[in-house]
């Protein structure tokens, strides 16, 4: 049964501006450990790839927070939800800490779809209740 849906679109220039103002501290605030490692690897190869990666993760976390009905409020924090990849490459939501407990206690699972183009990053999340 569908528990909630969420979508988010962000102009990639907004993420670039935030990075310009705050540097990598902005990425460190938004990304979990595994995401941050991937961000740095992508950014080191091609800066635009790192920027698009950060924008898609930002959009996905916003969409996820809407789908679970909490917004960015405890137990939902930026780093408690990571958007990682299954071995197939499919993006997946991986939660930790109090957010993982919330998901388990409520019998919730999430599916995420992300995409980006030159100007925008978009994410769509469906949260299902078992």
From Swiss-Prot:
EC top class, as a word: transferase
Coarse class of the protein's main subcellular location: cytoplasm
A GO cellular-component term linked to this record: cytoplasm
UniProt keywords, alphabetically: Cytoplasm, Fatty acid biosynthesis, Fatty acid metabolism, Lipid biosynthesis, Lipid metabolism, Magnesium, Metal-binding, Transferase
Cofactor list: Mg(2+)
Substrates-to-products reaction catalysed: apo-[ACP] + CoA = holo-[ACP] + adenosine 3',5'-bisphosphate + H(+)
Enzyme Commission designation: 2.7.8.7
Alphabetized Pfam families for the sequence: ACPS
SUPFAM superfamilies according to UniProt: 4'-phosphopantetheinyl transferase (SSF56214)
Source superkingdom: Bacteria
GO biological process entries: fatty acid biosynthetic process
Gene Ontology MF annotations: holo-[acyl-carrier-protein] synthase activity; magnesium ion binding
Compartments, record wording: Cytoplasm
Binding site for Mg(2+): 8, 62
NCBIfam families, A to Z: acpS, pantethn_trn
Family in the record: Belongs to the P-Pant transferase superfamily. AcpS family.
Job description of the protein: Transfers the 4'-phosphopantetheine moiety from coenzyme A to a Ser of acyl-carrier-protein.
Protein name: Holo-[acyl-carrier-protein] synthase
Organism: Janthinobacterium sp. (strain Marseille) (Minibacterium massiliensis)
């Amino acid at each position: 049964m569908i528990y909630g849906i969420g979508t988010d679109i962000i102009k990639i220039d907004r993420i670039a501006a935030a990075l310009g103002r705050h540097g990598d501290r902005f990425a460190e605030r938004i990304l979990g450990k595994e995401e941050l490692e991937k961000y740095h690897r992508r950014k080191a190869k091609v800066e635009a790839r790192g920027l698009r990666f950060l924008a898609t993760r930002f959009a996905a976390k916003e969409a996820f927070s809407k789908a679970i009905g909490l917004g960015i409020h405890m137990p939902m924090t930026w780093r408690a939800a990571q958007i990682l990849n299954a071995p197939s490459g499919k993006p997946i939501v991986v939660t930790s800490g109090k957010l993982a407990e919330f998901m388990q206690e409520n019998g919730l699972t999430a599916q995420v779809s992300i995409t980006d183009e030159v100007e925008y990053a978009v994410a769509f999340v469906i949260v299902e209740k078992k």
